Amino acid sequence: MEIPFATDWLRLPARKDGNETRLAYFRRQIILSKPPASCPILITADARYKLYVNGCFVQAGPQKAIDATAWYVDPAELAPFLRAGKNAVAVEVLYFGSDGHSSLLETRTPHLYIGDENGRLSGKSGWRCTAVDGVSFPKPQNTPSGTREDAAGEPRFSGWKTTMYDDSDWEDAVPYTLYEKLLKGGPFCLVPRTIPLI
């Protein structure tokens, strides 16, 4: 699989450079005249993602990077989950921050990459996003992962993975530009994952 120089990264518009672990939601709605026979995409995130289509779990990833020379990207086939009419693609992104596990590469805020040659879901525009304030990650003592999750249910996110959800109070996700990458570093060198998806 040949992966072009990766510039279709998205981030939250309110950049919050810091050490804390954070959770963010990204979503996009598309309208299809009929279900496609195939809808392949490439997806990865800083540092972990869970991908959903129309409320159905598709997959989680990416494979953990070994060093700063490569960031693993996953293929995903969305066609089995798509239907005629309105569709919702939703991604939960967990960012560990610099207080996270020392072997995890990181930017400075939750990031999502979507590569789509057909242009239906390209990361260049059309994505909505929000930070999730009801989930916190206090740093515990003596845990190998370096994080613990404390989650309080937020009614405002009920159904956020479905087409029925109203994301009008969310913000537009913004591109993580080449300029930012050159200035602050970032995961632009993507390589295919080397182990099977679980």
What kind of region is each of these model predictions?
Residues 20-32, 71-78:
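Short beta-strands within extracellular/lumenal beta-sheet-rich domains
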Residues 30-33, 37-52, 87-91, 170:
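Aromatic-lined ligand-binding clefts that engage carbohydrates, nucleic acids, or primary amines
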Residues 50-106:
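Beta-strand-rich ligand-recognition modules
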